[in-house]
């Protein structure tokens, strides 16, 4: 069966999710999701929402997720030894050398990510996940490419495993004319609008074949000669992502869809407030028919001008809807706060006594809401993304080949980073309570400082290798400092002894005689 036929067949299952995504996009970021088969071929007038709360929430949530999944300063993964595969006589020196090698590999991968535009593509994919609930990421040799929901269809089994993916995109004929005969490319060169087009519809068909994925591209039901590819499941470059999953559904649902009611209500109230405020701001004067003041005289009068007439004959039209506007304004404020909390937009209490601790607790409560999102994205995105990155680096020779049975990559971002943050808070509170209850001496007597430093570093995701001195090094330096201090004390005691009256020749005759005898003694 041709890829175009499969795409049209599977598009019927996608229509409901695509329509919900389009409605969610209209209230937040209208440019993200277009119609059923609309492409970015020309300018289209998009409807602008009357409120920007939804757009701000989507951008904020996507940015927080991106920084949590791919942090800038720290690594999102670590290479660790599988303890079950190592012997008990494994020397600690060898383990330290391996840790240094692993750290070098991690730096190489992070440098390659920083040099590419992966974070830009990941942020775009997360925006689609927040709004539409679905996105397809393709990891090519040139970087990441994001497919919106209206450009691909997917088929999954009962367990949610991907069976088939078909994408549709428009590509210039000049790029693929060497792979197909000219007469094939000339088919359907006139669009539905009776306009000549230099682009053709290219369908990419990805199917699962046992423990691997195979794919090819078709144009007008003809396979492109250089488009075939295959990859094992664990390093598959096609990564379909879902935000919220429902058992039995092949597509996900976005964060916006969960709070679409509040967004629609806020949109209606914002429109009413904006239009009502514009009507109330309009100034219209009325003149009594029996007044001596003519409307033309009033209209022509400048600022500060003097005209003839009575003030009672001139009035101003007032809307008189202040109470109604106040009710709508208060309800809109309530909806805005609820939407901001849903999209993890931190609202600090405006007061003169807002403390840093209150801000920190508010931020921590917002981060704890990301637990479920981190868990899903860690499994669906970070694991295949890391496997593909490591495989490409090994093929290019940038890093040595990693034995899978001994070394295993572990994700330390996302939900794991959130758990480390909670461990840090618990440890800090424990030490603070211990110092306040038993005093600082108790910490020095009962707490293992070396272990505290290691746990705090682990909670921050910091590698302590060659950074923090070991207890043996600290003890050696303390012993050397103590010996140096004792030597200085002995030297000072000798100097002080020379200054005592017993050793002073002017005050002790015996010492003076001994010095004279030493001077009179001839040299040998």
Residue ranges of predicted features:
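Extended, helix-rich architectural segments
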Residues: 1-185
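Charged, low-complexity, helix/coiled-coil-prone segments
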Residues: 2-8, 37-55, 63-75, 93-96, ...
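Short, hydrophobic/amphipathic alpha-helical patches that form generic packing surfaces
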Residues: 63-71, 260-279, 432, 451-458, ...
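Long, contiguous amphipathic alpha-helices that act as assembly "spine/axial" helices in icosahedral shell
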Residues: 31, 58, 99-141, 251-286, ...
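C-terminal anchoring/interaction modules
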Residues: 1-20, 25, 286-524
């Amino acid at each position: 069966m041709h890829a175009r036929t499969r795409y049209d067949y599977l598009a019927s299952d996608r229509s409901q999710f695509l329509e919900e995504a389009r409605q969610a996009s209209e209230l937040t970021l209208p440019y993200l999701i277009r119609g059923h088969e609309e492409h970015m071929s020309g300018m289209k007038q998009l409807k602008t929402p009357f409120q920007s709360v939804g757009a701000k929430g989507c951008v904020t949530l996507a940015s927080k997720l991106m920084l949590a999944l791919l942090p800038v300063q720290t690594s999102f993964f670590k290479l660790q030894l599988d303890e079950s595969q190592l012997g008990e006589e494994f020397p600690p020196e060898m383990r330290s050398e391996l840790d240094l090698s692993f750290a070098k590999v991690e730096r190489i991968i992070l440098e390659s990510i920083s040099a590419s535009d992966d974070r830009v593509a990941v942020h775009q994919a997360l925006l689609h996940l927040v709004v539409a609930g679905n996105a397809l990421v393709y990891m090519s040799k040139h970087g990441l490419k994001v497919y919106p929901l209206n450009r691909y269809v997917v088929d999954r089994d009962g367990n949610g495993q991907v069976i088939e993916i078909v994408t549709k995109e428009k590509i210039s004929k000049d790029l693929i004319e060497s792979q197909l005969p000219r007469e094939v490319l000339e088919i359907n060169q006139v669009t539905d609008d009776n306009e000549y087009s230099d682009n053709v519809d290219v369908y990419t068909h990805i199917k699962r074949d046992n423990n691997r994925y195979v794919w090819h591209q078709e144009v007008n039901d003809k396979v492109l000669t250089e488009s075939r590819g295959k990859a094992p499941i664990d390093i598959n470059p096609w990564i379909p992502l879902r935000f919220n999953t429902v058992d039995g559904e092949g597509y996900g649902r976005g964060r916006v869809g969960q709070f679409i009611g509040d967004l629609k209500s806020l949109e209606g109230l914002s429109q009413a407030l904006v239009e009502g405020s514009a009507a109330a701001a309009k100034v219209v004067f009325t003149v009594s028919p029996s007044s001596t003041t003519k409307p033309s005289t009033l209209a022509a009068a400048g600022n500060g001008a003097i005209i003839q007439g009575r003030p009672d004959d001139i009035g101003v039209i007032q809307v008189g809807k202040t109470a109604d506007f106040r009710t709508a304004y208060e309800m809109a404020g309530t909806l805005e706060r609820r939407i901001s909390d849903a999209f993890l937009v931190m609202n600090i209490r405006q007061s003169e006594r807002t403390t840093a601790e209150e801000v920190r607790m508010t931020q921590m409560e917002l981060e704890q809401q990301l637990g479920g999102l981190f868990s899903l994205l860690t499994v669906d995105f970070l694991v295949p993304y890391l496997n593909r990155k490591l495989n490409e680096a090994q093929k290019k020779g940038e890093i040595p080949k990693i034995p899978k049975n001994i070394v295993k990559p572990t994700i330390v971002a996302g939900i794991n980073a959130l758990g480390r943050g909670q461990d840090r808070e618990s440890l800090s509170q424990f030490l603070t309570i211990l110092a306040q209850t038993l005093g600082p001496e108790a910490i020095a007597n009962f707490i293992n400082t070396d272990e505290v430093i290691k746990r705090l570093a682990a909670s921050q995701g910091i590698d302590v290798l060659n950074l923090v001195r070991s207890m043996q090094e600290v003890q050696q330096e303390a012993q050397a400092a103590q010996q140096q201090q004792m030597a200085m004390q002995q030297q000072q005691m000798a100097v002080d002894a020379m200054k005592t009256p017993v050793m002073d020749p002017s005050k002790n005759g015996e010492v003076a005689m001994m010095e004279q005898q030493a001077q009179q003694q001839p040299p040998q």
